[in-house]
Amino acid sequence: MSGAPEGGRPEDLSRRLAQVRSRISAASHAASSSEPRLIVVTKYFPASDVRILAGLGVSDVGENRGQEAAAKAAELEDLSLAWHFIGQLQSNKARSVVRYARSVHSVDRVSLVTALGKAVAAEQERRAGAGSEPRPDLDCYLQFSLHPDGTADGRGGALPADAAGLAEKVAGTAGLRLAGVMAVAPVDASPDEAFARLLMISASVRAVDPSATGVSAGMSGDLEAAVAAGATHLRIGSDVLGPRPAVG
């Protein structure tokens, strides 16, 4: 049996989170930059872990499985958490995601932008009919492939050449806010070189909207490289939560 001893999960998460925060602080100091925002990716882990993390000061949670994320967000609605959807998103799932997500980090095609815009409009109508507060505009991070040969890969993402057009589509869609860019460093490439490419893409996006300064980059294995490159958001899972539980 793996994981923390019985009754020791809060201590285990506290220790792991402190180690990650220390790495982020050291990397930021080395880069002479402000610390990026930590998004803890809780895919496959229970809502009870998220509640513990919230008690430890975590305010941003990332998920990439829509049904799992929706269930956790509903169970934890008493907490002030910002939910970030970071997985590849089918257009027909947009309506469910905008019910709980503050942002989507995987916007990679015009058809998805259209679907998200319609979903936000429908969600605003639903909330108005229920007498609820309107939701804020949905923050959209444009995901790009950083494959060295300039092609798309299995991790999703638009091609860099499509940056301006995709950014203009988001900027022109009511209910959406162009927040910045996102990418996953290719497994067969230097993260430093990959994130340098992402910064060049970010410049193209900021040419459309100068306020789109977000750079969502860096995971457990390459957060130092991401911080050095100027990431504003880090998506960290296993180094905070430990090995993924077995999934049946």
Where are the model-predicted features located?
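Conserved alpha/beta-domain cores
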Residues: S2-G221, V227-A229, L241-P243
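Nucleotide-sugar donor-binding patch of glycosyltransferase catalytic domains
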Residues: V247
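Divalent-metal-activated hydrolytic enzyme cores
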Residues: T232-H233
